Amino acid sequence: MKVTVVYYPGDPAAKGAAEALEREYGIKALELPEDPPFFDFNSLAGDAFIVLSRHSSEKRVKAFTVHHTGNFGEAKLGGEPKRLGVAYPSLACSLLRAMNAFRREGYDVTYEATHHGPTSDKPLVFAEIGSVKEDWEDPANHEVLAKAVASWEEHRCEAPKAVWVGGPHYSKRATKRCLEGEACFGHIAPKYALDHLDEDLLRQMVERSFERPERAYVEKKSLKSELRLRVVKALEDLGLEVLVV
């Protein structure tokens, strides 16, 4: 499985990290002609992709983030509505662990929930610098992201593959389990997306993954009893071990 690094030059975080990646590690990232959420990755020759990107946050939280793509509801930023992209759980967790190893003081490292486009049929993971212009343009952040991308295989996650249902957009509980080697996470469905979460989307969370998940974590506090029982049954019917946490 060849993993290709890509970036959009109109994104200062992505451009800076791509330049650092080539300068420091001799890895040349592929330049995209448009912003990644709207790009058709199925047209590229690579097997899987790491997408260098900026991350925006109204709360101005300084962070390095990792997430998969897809839309549980409307397609407000690329992709198709109610369709998920293809996750790559071990790659995402490995990147997160590498980010954690090299992160700067004052910066968080976290999984984000699955969101925005593209809804590609090829596995891809967004690796991001957040969350405002000064962070995106900071050369020290470019160095951290470049080093994490260059060394992700040295931080490879061999833990069971999993999905997560519930909780906030920034999934600290999933992040903790990845960093501790308990599980590598693919798609994460946050609490705000639960109104859209039907059996088809639950199936996509499991089947739209390069590595099929064998486990699911369901946050008890996020789901009312009736919904929780329905979600647990659907995931068990898909063959997953379900942990209510």
Curated annotation (Swiss-Prot):
Its EC number is 3.1.1.96. Keywords: Hydrolase, Metal-binding, Zinc. Belongs to the DtdA deacylase family. It comes from Ignicoccus hospitalis (strain KIN4/I / DSM 18386 / JCM 14125). This is D-aminoacyl-tRNA deacylase. GO terms for molecular function: D-aminoacyl-tRNA deacylase activity; zinc ion binding. Monomer. It catalyses: a D-aminoacyl-tRNA + H2O = a tRNA + a D-alpha-amino acid + H(+); glycyl-tRNA(Ala) + H2O = tRNA(Ala) + glycine + H(+).
